Amino acid sequence: MLLLLHRKHDAQTDAYGLYLATCSSDKKVKVFDISDNKKPLLIKTLEGHEGPVWQVAWAHPTFGTILATCSYDKTVIVWKKGPTPDDWTNIFTYKEHTSSVNSINWAPHEFGLILAAGSSDMTASVHTCITETRWESVKIEAHNVGCNAVSWAPALQNRRFVTGGCDNLVKIWKLDEEAHKWINEHTLEGHTDWVRDVAWAPCLGQGRNIIASCGQDCRVIIWTQERDQWRRKELSRFRDVVWLVSWAITGNVLAVSGGDNNVSLWTERENGEWDTFSEVNNVPMPQPLPPTSLVRSSHQLAAAKQLDAD
């Protein structure tokens, strides 16, 4: 199940469910051992940011145990675990953004160790690991006022990712392999206020591209690509700002959370309409900027509840 974690800005488990990383406004990132399904054991506190830490993101285990973090302090940091649980090293720091870095997302591992980030300085950045000590970074002029969210497309196609911004737009970016530059392939209009989150759906067995976006305008929009065009379908209007959208790994269930402290699950019916089939009400949730994140597994939620109880 896709559920919500309160109090922390973000919490993510690694691919094997061995570690849980959390971050918050105390500038710290905490890594817990959750491998025994008992009380989470704090094994490392990562300190390096100088402001609230908004998001954490685990890289694919192909590359080792690697965690990326982003912060209000305008930086992105990539950490790697050594041979012992408490041995963590900062292997990359990016300081070229001029405002808060709000969102990070790793590319599919088939493309290599590549991280995208979105910032309030109106840009997105893409960071490619050549070696652990050498990274190549590029900035893209993405959204007027600021970029709130980034999400990569599945690896079944060329390198693409989607961004959402304070200009009310959703933009799709494609790598021009010959020119070695990112180009704005599509700009999707439909929101009437800031886009708070975007999520490109996994395409297991679907054979089509689907993106979910949500915003300050209380809307959730499902974008489906048909040939070179994107078709828009809006879910039923929500009562409050919608902070987050998150797909199940199968790509056919969407979790939505917002300012009304509710989390709802949606799926597409055979007639193409989207319906909600489950809802959790009155989930305590602060509203930082960026907003809190969805926990992506019940294992993660159980660990988080134990942390909050301490």
Feature map (PLM): residue ranges:
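WD40/WD-repeat beta-propeller blade N-cap
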Residues: 2-8, 46-53, 94-101, 140-147, ...
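Beta-strand-rich domains and repeat architectures in extracellular enzymes and scaffolds
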Residues: 3-27
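WD40/WD-repeat beta-propeller blade-loop signature
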Residues: 7, 16, 42, 52, ...
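WD40-repeat beta-propellers
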Residues: 29-33, 56, 76-81, 104, ...
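Terminal intrinsically disordered, low-complexity extensions flanking WD-repeat/beta-propeller proteins
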Residues: 157, 180, 187, 206-211, ...
